[in-house]
């Protein structure tokens, strides 16, 4: 995705934090980056950085760099951060495009990424528990690996002037602008219902008024 949108990319700056998830994600990125020997991997490691030092490092990134936002919850000082940390990083790199493999920063910073295609697995886990209970002799592993899906933020795509059609695979667009009807469906139907009630009330009132006028001369 990155090379399709930015073919001149030479550096990938990967951001990960000081948690098990961050370390695991960094190990996966290191492994996958071996498939792209022409790209230089710059590690923004939360085990060696605080939020302040990593912001300074981001400001010093070389040209033709793309940021890959893994996760950021805990820094080297074991300080816990919410979304404000990634906002600070975003403000430090306004001209550098960012992507994510984890959905972190998607919707306000990252343009898109390849994300896990999560689904409800409660039923599958229950069936597997029943199977293990009924067939204890079956020691085989019946694992289902969750796949991935390509996602793009439609607002960021428009902001950066990108064209999803250049991608050689299907992509899901999120945060697409909704129509006036979709945004105010409840209010529109409520107004229509109120209008119908008022019209019916008016018709009934006029009907009874006409009956009164008709009956008056006969008195």
Please annotate each region the language model reported.
Residues 1-211:
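Short hydrophobic alpha-helices and adjacent helix-cap/hinge residues
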Residues 210-218:
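Residue-level detector of conserved catalytic or cofactor/ligand-binding positions
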